[in-house]
């Protein structure tokens, strides 16, 4: 029940395809934004909104915890990561990435639940994109945390999701990505505007999963990794001839840069600002 008459409930919010596109954008936004309205205010419980952005902290977790990246900032979470020493206080990076990934899962589940009975033209594609974004979030959770809670759109509201184990989660993600690749709903490479996901993103995610399959499941999948990588390249990707162009503001318009991007997280000056992404890299 809405708190006031101007608030929409789920039955009112989704009426047209544009409504569903806005709902899908809400899922995409969880990868790049600190909140819906203000990059200086996070919608998760952190001390610093800038430290809550997913791409920023995913990079930090992967690179700063080894010798690939060093930072002289005095933030406690940075010191812990660079020295691989941990305290009882939750680390800002591990907390942000975990919470943001679970936020993607939650938003995608709600979107899929609310769109399951609709029959609008174009909606199956939006649902396929939501399924990929959810599968990719589960991939990050499996890779970094091992055995996260597993929830789907069918889960009863308020019920605690169960943990199915790392191997079972790997198998679910693999099956979900293969289903998206075999179906017609997820767009082909080049069929949708930058940075919407395509089958290239699903194929590349499979390749990344197979590279580390022995850690996730106990069984190596080297040939599958090679096959998936080659299949991705054959979808039309190529290296940008000028490496610097990959970091320009016109990625959505630069054909050379777009040839190299497989799954991009969008930032721009006007609509999707945050203290993450490349802003963090150059600050």
Predicted regions and their residues:
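Short acidic-aromatic linear motifs embedded in glycine-rich loops, typified by GG[WY][YF]DAGD(H)
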Residues: 1-129, 133, 138-144, 148-154, ...
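Short coil/turn connectors between adjacent alpha-helices in alpha-solenoid helical repeat scaffolds
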Residues: 97-100, 163-167, 214-224
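Flexible helix-coil transition and linker loops at the boundaries of alpha-helical arrays
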Residues: 114-124, 183-194
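Amphipathic alpha-helical segments of tetratricopeptide repeats
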Residues: 182, 233-234
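Amphipathic alpha-helical protein-interaction segments enriched in hydrophobic
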Residues: 194-205
């Amino acid at each position: 029940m809405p708190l006031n008459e101007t608030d929409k409930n789920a039955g009112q919010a989704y009426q047209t395809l544009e409504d569903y596109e806005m709902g899908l954008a809400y899922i995409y936004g969880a990868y790049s934004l600190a909140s819906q309205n203000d990059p200086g205010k996070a919608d998760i419980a952190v001390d610093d909104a800038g430290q809550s952005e997913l791409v920023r902290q995913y990079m930090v977790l992967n690179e700063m915890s080894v010798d690939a990246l060093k930072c002289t900032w005095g933030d406690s979470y940075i010191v812990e990561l660079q020295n691989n020493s941990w305290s009882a206080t939750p680390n800002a990076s591990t907390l942000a990435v975990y919470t943001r990934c679970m936020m993607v899962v939650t938003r995608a589940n709600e979107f899929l639940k609310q769109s399951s009975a609709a029959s609008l033209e174009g909606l199956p594609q939006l649902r396929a994109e939501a399924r990929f974004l959810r599968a990719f979030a589960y991939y990050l959770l499996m890779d970094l945390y091992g055995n996260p809670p597993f929830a789907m759109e069918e889960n009863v509201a308020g019920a605690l999701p169960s943990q199915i184990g790392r191997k079972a989660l790997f198998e679910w993600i693999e099956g979900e990505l293969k289903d998206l690749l075999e179906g017609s709903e997820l767009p082909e490479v080049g069929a949708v505007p930058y940075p919407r996901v395509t089958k290239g993103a699903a194929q590349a995610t499979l390749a990344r999963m197979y590279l580390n399959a022995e850690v996730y499941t106990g069984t190596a999948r080297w040939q599958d990794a090679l096959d998936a990588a080659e299949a991705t390249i054959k979808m039309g990707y190529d290296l940008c001839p000028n490496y610097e162009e990959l970091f320009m503001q016109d990625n959505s318009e630069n054909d050379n840069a777009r040839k190299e991007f497989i799954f991009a997280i969008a930032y721009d000056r006007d609509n999707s600002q945050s203290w993450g992404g490349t802003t963090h890299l150059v600050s």
